[in-house]
Amino acid sequence: MSGLPIATNLYFDAHFHRHGVKLLPNEFYTTREDMVLVTVLGSCVAACLHDPIGRIGGMNHFMLPDDGADPSAAASESMRYGAYAMEVLINELIKAGGRRERFEAKVFGGAAVLAGMTTINIGDRNADFVRRYLALERIRITAEDLQGVHPRKVAFMPHTGQAMVKKLRVQAPDVAAREAALAREAVDPHGERAPRVRPRVELFGTPAPKAQAKPRIELFGMRATQPATRKQEA
């Protein structure tokens, strides 16, 4: 199992007027600096963790590799990889001074961004995993924007815990190309797709199951004059 690398794509974000880091798939980043962590998600998920008292936070970006196992089996290689991606983020935050019992989570992604992805079900598996993992670890999810058909651009302020999300076009070229590659990687070594869980029908705007509260997620990159856009601070 390979290590999860620290994101190194540093830049100055003109939209948020602060330094930022762009996370690619299978990267993570933690900091207590007043900066922004940004990533673009298709079927992958990003977990944003924050210690509101320590004012430290971090983000990861990962997907479960498909080993053909039953996704409900805790011992499968996929689950071990997902757990590792989460443990790296949690442990790095603790090493930097965060307290596990204070961590709050905001989770994003898990979309079906290609026509065939609802059959492959990668996004659903990623979304289900991150919810289940955080529940087992007793880390409260304070906001989520998971599943559906739209890629997402996510911005997270680790110093304050504020998160913002922007829905992208369903067939955003860069995301679609990346997701097509991920779909190919979901084919087993013998060239046939491994057995999947039950197929699902994507409904536009499907609500997250058993939401604990209204998601405190702000939409960014939208015109303020649009009456249908409701902004909420995360």
Curated annotation (Swiss-Prot):
One Pfam family per UniProt: CheD
Single GO MF descriptor = protein-glutamine glutaminase activity
- Which reaction(s) does its UniProt entry say it catalyses? L-glutaminyl-[protein] + H2O = L-glutamyl-[protein] + NH4(+)
Enzyme class (EC, first level): hydrolase
Tell whether Hydrolase is among the UniProt keywords.
Answer: yes
**Which EC number applies?**
3.5.1.44
Q: Which residues cross the membrane?
A: none
Keyword set, alphabetical order: Chemotaxis, Hydrolase
Picking any one GO biological process from the record gives: chemotaxis
Function noted in UniProt: Probably deamidates glutamine residues to glutamate on methyl-accepting chemotaxis receptors (MCPs), playing an important role in chemotaxis.
Q: NCBIfam families from the xrefs?
A: PRK13487.1, PRK13489.1
What PANTHER family has UniProt attached to this entry? CHEMORECEPTOR GLUTAMINE DEAMIDASE CHED-RELATED (PTHR35147:SF2)
Task: State the family it belongs to.
Answer: Belongs to the CheD family.
Q: What is this protein called?
A: Probable chemoreceptor glutamine deamidase CheD
Annotated organism of origin: Burkholderia mallei (strain ATCC 23344)
